[in-house]
Amino acid sequence: MKVKINEVHSVFAWSWHIPSTSDEDAANNDPIGNDEDEDVCGICRASYNGTCPSCKFPGDQCPLVIGLCHHNFHDHCIYRWLDTPTSKGLCPMCRQTFQLQKGLAINDAHVQKFVEIVSRRREEMIEEGVAEEFVDFDEPIRQNTDNPIGRQQVDTILDEDFLLR
């Protein structure tokens, strides 16, 4: 018996490797237990493995970024969000200061673009005279002298200094 192959059609699938955010997730590396609702961009609600509304094709042209607060977004979505006056430099999901998580290969290519957008937005707000509303990206951890514990992470929404400005 002889077999002649006329055509070959390759089929493949890919997905982003998003580092787990907790020790429990790392210990339980079972993809069956993952919640599908968590695999969407918090801004455009499109799948991470799909594209944002700005892109036509998934992959390197529509990459992800991971915030220090462990929220993930398409890079086009978060940059467009951070460039709006209402964002005030905060994560759209948890309203903490949005910063790229350091030490992740997925974020390395976006650091310079992130710094440029934040700097440009800060300069625009200074010109408009509303720079005090912009959250300082350089100091996400503040010294709390009333607390005997000392340095602590401050939730930006509940920070009294922020509310009084």
Curated annotation (Swiss-Prot):
Coiled coil: none annotated. Pathway: Protein modification; protein ubiquitination. InterPro entries: RING-box_E3_Ubiquitin_Ligase (IPR051031), RING-H2_APC11 (IPR024991), Znf_RING (IPR001841), Znf_RING/FYVE/PHD (IPR013083). Probably catalytic subunit of the anaphase promoting complex/cyclosome (APC/C), a cell cycle-regulated E3 ubiquitin-protein ligase complex that controls progression through mitosis and the G1 phase of the cell cycle. The APC/C is thought to confer substrate specificity and, in the presence of ubiquitin-conjugating E2 enzymes, it catalyzes the formation of protein-ubiquitin conjugates that are subsequently degraded by the 26S proteasome. A zinc finger (RING-type) spans 52-95. GO terms for biological process: anaphase-promoting complex-dependent catabolic process; cell division; positive regulation of mitotic metaphase/anaphase transition; protein ubiquitination; regulation of meiotic cell cycle; regulation of mitotic cell cycle; ubiquitin-dependent protein catabolic process. This is Anaphase-promoting complex subunit 11. Present with 377 molecules/cell in log phase SD medium. It is an enzyme of class 6 (ligase). The APC/C is composed of at least 13 subunits that stay tightly associated throughout the cell cycle: APC1, APC2, APC4, APC5, APC9, APC11, CDC16, CDC23, CDC26, CDC27, DOC1, MND2 and SWM1. It holds the Pfam family zf-ANAPC11. Its EC number is 6.3.2.-.
